[in-house]
Design a protein with these regions (language model features):
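A short beta-strand-loop structural module common to alpha/beta enzyme folds
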Residues: 33-43, 169-173
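N-terminal beta1-alpha1 ligand-phosphate binding loop
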Residues: 2-33, 143
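Short histidine/acidic/glycine/proline-rich micro-motifs that form metal-
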Residues: 10-13, 88, 141-145, 176-178
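Glycine-rich phosphate/pyrophosphate-binding loop and the adjoining helix
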Residues: 28-30, 145-202
Length: 202
């Protein structure tokens, strides 16, 4: 099974990183895994400028930024499942993951219909990664789950935009220290079981 895990925390070995690894262990308990783990903050991923170069309205050109994202998107299309992880930063996902989703826009291929005069009368997008399975992983300092209400909405909305099939969610609260989740057997088990489910759901 080919898995791409997108680590949206700026800290390696963080609670999110640990939980993502537990999800992957769960997948490995059911099937062989070919893992492609992306550390956003260690990658050369420039900020999206919203130029729309990829849009058919502007010639469906390649992204002009020319960084690591080109290869990431090509590999993403070959993945069987995607894992997106982020800590709660200001009640939402990290700036790095926000930009990552923006840079995924070339995965949305627009199809348009014109009338006899050339006016656009209908347009729709068809994601190149539609139907792929996805899991989200979230950690926060606050003990109140409601603190991540916006974050979870943002993650789910992005998955819907790309027509991904969310098959699981790992959500850990009260992580006051770095790597504290290592002490939380229930959260580690949830991550492992989510990975096992990801492996077997068709």
């Amino acid at each position: 099974m080919k898995i791409m895990a997108i680590m949206g925390s700026p800290r390696k070995g963080s609670n999110v990183d640990i939980l993502i690894d537990e999800v992957i262990k769960g997948v490995k308990s059911k099937t062989a895994v070919e893992l492609d783990k992306i550390y956003i903050y260690e990658s050369d991923i420039k900020y999206c400028t919203g130029c729309g170069a990829h849009s058919i309205l502007q010639g469906a050109k390649d992204c002009p930024l020319g960084d690591d994202m080109d290869g990431i998107l090509k590999r993403m299309q070959k993945a069987d499942a995607l894992i997106f992880g982020s800590p709660n930063h200001g009640r939402t996902i990290t700036a790095g993951l926000t930009n990552f989703f923006a840079r995924m826009m070339p995965m949305l291929k627009m199809q348009i219909e014109r009338d006899e005069e050339g006016n656009i009368i209908h347009a729709e997008t068809k994601p190149l990664i539609r139907g792929k399975k996805a899991v989200t992983v979230v950690s926060q300092v606050d003990f109140a789950a409601s603190s991540s209400a916006l974050l979870l909405m943002v993650l789910d909305a992005n998955l819907r935009d790309f027509h991904l099939r969310k098959v699981g969610e790992v959500f850990s609260t009260g992580n006051l220290k770095r790597a504290q989740v290592k002490e939380k057997e229930a959260d580690l088990n949830l991550a492992f079981e989510t990975g096992a489910r990801l492996a077997v759901i068709k």
